[in-house]
Amino acid sequence: MEKFTIYKGTSVPVMNDNIDTDQIIPKQFLKAIDKKGFGKNLFYEWRYLKDYDENPDFILNAPKYKKASLLISGDNFGSGSSREHAAWALSDYGFRAIIAGSYSDIFYNNALKNGLLPIKQPREVLNQLTKLSSQEEITIDLPHQLIITSLGDFHFEIDPIWKDKLINGLDDIGITLQYEEAISAYEQKNQ
């Protein structure tokens, strides 16, 4: 998993509440188990009209938001099914963090497990962030738990264990591999 310490990127506001995992990545695209390739179909039913013709009315298709890597959204983001593919699609598209009012518990944990930082903020802060220019960079400082903007700095909470995992780029396999020598020694001893 890629380390997440201090990240700078531009943002795109998709301020709907209750964006569910089927809207993030529709079920017809869940046939693969590799984490790559899902970004093309992110928000498929909103982004495209037919045959991948871009919907000019969907904000991610606006040229000024094409390189956004921070998604700002409303409450209850990632509700619906438990598909991990939703986090994969957001990451594969290029998002590194989501700033929303709240998340479904399963999506929140799936995002963290895949190195995608879900940040909770109150509606007042979300509304302020949507006023930023599409070209203005936002800094996410995970060690200090801050969102840094020209409008001010906004603190966020994160479980210290997840914070440590993200800062060190450790998923569950990475954590296990830290004990590789001890595991090998145990296996040698108990053959």
Curated annotation (Swiss-Prot):
**Catalytic activity annotation:** (2R,3S)-3-isopropylmalate = (2S)-2-isopropylmalate
Q: Name one GO cellular component term.
A: 3-isopropylmalate dehydratase complex
Q: Could you tell me the EC number(s) of this protein?
A: 4.2.1.33
**Entry keyword annotation includes Lyase:** yes
Q: How does it assemble?
A: Heterodimer of LeuC and LeuD.
Family, per entry: Belongs to the LeuD family. LeuD type 1 subfamily.
This one is known as 3-isopropylmalate dehydratase small subunit
Record organism: Lactococcus lactis subsp. lactis (strain IL1403) (Streptococcus lactis)
